[in-house]
Design a protein with these regions (language model features):
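Alpha/propeptide regions of enzymes that mature by internal proteolysis
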Residues: 1-206
Length: 206
């Protein structure tokens, strides 16, 4: 199930300068999603879970030298999927983007993973080419949510064991209270569940 918001855009691309792109492999049930921030953006993160897989999230802590990011990557493939960030960095570098170190521009791309290796084909994982393709696909259109990109193999409800897993997905939102703008994007392996239909939210309702 995939939800496209064609009317009012309540996704993060409603924020000026934000573009989102997906790379999706439906047969292998994996993918990645990139959020590009034109002009760079201040970001924060809250890392949770018993086995988080992240890249460059430590630099988002207060007091770090680099205060702004160029993109965020959410990816399937567990820790292997972090390689997709290399493709995002390559795409940004080709555009002359990144943190100016004085000798080179280094694109800042925090990334986080979803463990989806047990859902589809464990041998197919997002890599550098997938991250690059997600950047090429990025646009300011309303974000296609649910089953796509990093949400393709996302699951929830596994506390009692993987046999109880239900289909997850990807969602995003933006909030503009009193001109203080916030935006968020989450893979619903950590947040709420999208696409649960019959039978009982299994992958057969894709």
């Amino acid at each position: 199930m995939q939800r496209d918001l064609a009317d009012a855009n309540s996704t993060i691309t409603a924020v000026q300068g934000v573009r989102v792109g997906h790379w999706t492999e439906h047969r292998a049930l994996t993918g990645c999603t990139v959020v590009l921030c034109d002009g760079r953006a201040v970001a924060a993160v809250d890392v949770r879970g018993g086995g988080p897989g992240t890249r460059e999230t430590d630099l988002l802590a207060p007091g770090r030298l680099v205060r702004r990011i160029d993109a965020v990557l959410l990816t399937g493939g567990s820790a292997f999927g972090l390689a997709a960030a290399d493709g995002v960095m390559r795409w940004l570098e080709e555009g002359g983007l990144g943190y100016d170190t004085g000798v080179a521009r280094v694109p800042i791309v925090p990334a986080a993973v979803v463990f989806d290796l047990g859902v589809g084909d464990q041998h197919v994982r997002p890599g550098p080419d997938a991250g690059y393709a997600a950047c090429e696909a990025a646009s300011a259109a309303p974000v296609a949510e649910g089953d796509g990109g990093a949400g393709t193999g996302a699951t929830v409800g596994k506390w009692a064991g993987p046999q109880y897993a239900m289909k997850g997905g990807l969602g995003s939102n933006h909030i503009d209270p009193n001109a203080r703008l916030c935006m968020s994007s989450a893979v619903t392996g950590f947040m709420s569940t999208y696409g649960v239909d019959e039978p009982a939210g299994t992958f057969t309702d894709l």
